[in-house]
């Protein structure tokens, strides 16, 4: 994949990360030539079959030869199959989830969005896992006690809106010490979660733990998350970085349509998380 190779090239030039390239060597060389990439300083492992290439690549990470795993030209289904491989994959026993990190102009803090790409309809248990996975990423980038906003259309609990009930339950679990390393406050609407000015006009805002300063936006389902994500990327043109979380090592899972800059950001995020995991595991 040309965008992936170009991202790898830029990441190396910026001293973010080096790479071991696994795949059809002839194709890699052909693509590298088209983007003026010098391969003389890269290790290339020649594997013609894409499925076997993915399996080989993920084994390098699970064996500790490499620090993170990045999706190349293989389709997402094949890539995830290698991540979940029982022999050489990166399973930990924890549920996997996807996190996107945005640096939004006008918002003082980084925003961590989850899950926008992996879990379609998260249960309460899934949401606990998503929070735990995303909190670990926050800790890795230097946010010791991130604020988590379980999002809904309203800020009050309404039995007819199960999302609000689950958000309140997550808040209670945090208060009882069942969810740690963060502050959970929900249900919250998006404006109350990330916009201090809007939050000040909401009834009861002064009693909330989050008033426009949420770090983690926990979406009720993949539809809400994906729509917000794509609006931010394609309308507001906000660049981000993405990781699959809950694995033994960082997994860079980006879309083929993502720009080189998004892929470089994802590698940078993965490098920071990999270093954190090494120091804390």
Residue ranges and their predicted role:
Residues 1-210, 215-281:
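Anion-binding alpha/beta catalytic cores of soluble intermediary-metabolism enzymes, centered on
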């Amino acid at each position: 994949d040309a965008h992936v190779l170009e991202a790898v090239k830029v990441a190396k030039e910026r001293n973010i990360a080096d790479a071991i390239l696994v795949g059809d060597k002839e194709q890699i060389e052909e693509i590298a030539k088209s983007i003026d990439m010098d391969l003389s300083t890269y290790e290339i492992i020649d594997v013609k079959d894409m499925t076997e290439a993915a399996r080989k690549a993920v084994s390098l990470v699970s064996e500790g030869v490499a620090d993170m795993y990045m999706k190349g030209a293989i389709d997402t289904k094949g890539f995830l199959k290698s991540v979940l491989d029982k022999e050489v994959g990166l399973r930990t026993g924890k549920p996997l989830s996807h996190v996107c990190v945005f640096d939004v102009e006008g918002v003082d803090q980084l925003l961590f969005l989850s899950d926008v790409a992996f879990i379609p309809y998260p249960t309460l248990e899934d949401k606990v896992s998503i929070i735990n996975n995303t909190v670990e990423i926050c800790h890795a980038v230097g946010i010791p006690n991130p604020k988590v906003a379980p999002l809904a259309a309203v800020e009050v609990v309404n039995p007819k809106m199960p999302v609000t009930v689950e958000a309140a339950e997550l808040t209670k679990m945090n208060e009882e010490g069942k969810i740690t390393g963060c502050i959970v406050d929900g249900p919250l609407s998006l404006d109350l979660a990330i916009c201090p000015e809007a939050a000040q006009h909401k009834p009861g805002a002064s009693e909330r733990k989050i008033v426009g300063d949420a770090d983690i936006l926990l979406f009720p389902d993949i539809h809400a998350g994906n729509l917000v994500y794509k609006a931010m990327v394609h309308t507001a043109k906000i660049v981000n970085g993405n990781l699959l979380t809950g694995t033994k090592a960082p997994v860079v899972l980006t879309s083929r349509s993502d720009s080189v800059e998004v892929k470089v950001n994802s590698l940078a995020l993965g490098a920071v998380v990999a270093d954190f995991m090494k120091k804390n595991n």
